[in-house]
Amino acid sequence: MDYILIGVILGIVQGISEWIPISSKTQVLIVSSSLLGLSFSVAYSFGLFMEIGTIAAAIIYFRREISGLLKALVRMSSRREDYLLLKFLVIVTIITGLMGVPLYLFVISLPILGLPMTVLGVVLLTDGIIIYLSRKNYISRKGLHDLRLRDIIIVGIAQGLAALPGVSRSGITTSALILLGVKPEEAFKLSFISLIPAALGAIGVTVLFSKHEVSQAVHSVSLSGLLISIVVATFVSIFFINALLRFARTNKVVVLVIILGIIAIISGILSGIAKGFY
């Protein structure tokens, strides 16, 4: 198959799956394994590296919030919200790193341990059930200023679990925030902004510990194919961020969250029965 077409396909898969409750890592892993024949560890590392496009999209879409964060970082902001968001991101990112790095090192050793690939489908299905239950029972009342240290730590732990293949980062962090009583629109927004430092850290860890796998993945898809996939992922991501946040502002948010929960459950079932993958 043409590498440019592969790049476009991977970019679309990454751009869509990052923001809805299906694991983008797992979807890219499945597609890249099917189209390129990559091994588990190489495909998994490639999936993390693909997040460059979604990081770019989040920075572009939330540029005002990023500007406020930078001002708060050097104590030049006059807005309390900027300092609260900075505190939130710092704590969440630290907890995510403490959870995520050991999990990542464990995951890339899975083929060595001989664990079956069916674990991906099981984890995805469990993730989907958690997402569905959390959205069914939430009471939306909180904003960023209402979150306590304990709440922020819980969000960090949830995001750290997303290092596991099959676990949706946006799905599990949004679910955690909604379970804590955060308003849906605020929960989506905080989850999406939290992606930026978490994904940057994930890419850094991937390059540090999996240089060979990343190099092999880039060679398999070609540098031009990789760049195309990142650009496509960026544009698709911007569209989906905007669509989800706009929908979350409406009184039809229950429809949105139920649909996202169903998508996660179906994704888990399909991954679990994809016999050609494992």
Swiss-Prot record:
The keyword Nucleotide-binding does not apply. The keyword Ribosomal protein does not apply. Belongs to the UppP family. Its EC number is 3.6.1.27. Pfam families: BacA. This is Undecaprenyl-diphosphatase. It is found in: Cell membrane. It is a multi-pass membrane protein. InterPro entries: UppP. GO terms for cellular component: plasma membrane. Its main location: membrane. It catalyses: di-trans,octa-cis-undecaprenyl diphosphate + H2O = di-trans,octa-cis-undecaprenyl phosphate + phosphate + H(+). Catalyzes the dephosphorylation of undecaprenyl diphosphate (UPP). Keywords: Cell membrane, Hydrolase, Membrane, Transmembrane, Transmembrane helix. One of its GO terms (molecular function) is undecaprenyl-diphosphatase activity. The chain crosses the membrane at residues 3-23, 42-62, 88-108, 112-132, 152-172, 190-210, 225-245, 253-273.
